[in-house]
């Protein structure tokens, strides 16, 4: 069991994200690289760090209290229909125009996940009040690391803040991906 994260630690992390820093952190799935999904400089830096194609979208972690600012789609209702809060699930949903940089949007949609099973992330997202980029902590095309020790040194050196290895919380596997039409994509 991981020690709880103090509210002062969460606030410091939220402040780092608001300041445009990139973090390496445990998610409800795998270790992720993230930052402010509304900040174009952060998005471009993450794309560059991962050597990622601009055509590949990134997931945003969101909070149920404010997801309505980004989509008119009933994200919370969709999770309730799935009735599997314990299985990390990413939904591809329509996005409201102009609320996120175009680098985060593909064909009018965005991939979002509410990390129900990860208390610290839910608290962090509530503090942030905006989406957090969540992409695996690897160079695009390389194996997704399941443990902190497997993360490439170039990734660790390229971010502004790294969560301690003792903070690992995830399932160590990618989330399930469900399209707007309910079709399982992954």
Per-region residue spans from a language model:
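Active-site-adjacent structural elements in enzyme catalytic cores
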Residues: 1-186
């Amino acid at each position: 069991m991981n020690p709880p994260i103090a509210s002062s630690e969460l606030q410091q992390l939220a402040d780092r994200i608001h300041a445009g820093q990139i973090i390496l952190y445990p998610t409800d799935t795998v270790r992720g690289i993230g930052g402010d999904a509304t900040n174009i400089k952060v998005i471009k830096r993450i794309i560059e760090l991962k050597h990622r194609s601009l055509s590949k979208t990134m997931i945003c972690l969101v909070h149920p209290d404010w997801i309505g600012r980004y989509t008119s789609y009933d994200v919370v209702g969709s999770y309730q229909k799935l009735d599997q809060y314990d299985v990390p699930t990413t939904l591809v949903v329509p996005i409201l125009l102009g609320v996120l940089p175009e680098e985060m949007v593909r064909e009018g949609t965005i991939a979002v996940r509410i990390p129900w099973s990860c208390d610290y992330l839910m608290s962090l997202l509530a503090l942030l009040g905006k989406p957090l980029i969540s992409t695996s902590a690897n160079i695009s095309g390389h194996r997704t690391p399941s443990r902190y020790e497997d993360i490439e040194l170039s990734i660790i050196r390229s971010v502004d803040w790294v969560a301690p290895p003792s903070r690992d919380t995830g399932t160590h596997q990618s989330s399930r991906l469900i399209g707007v039409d309910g079709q399982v994509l992954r």
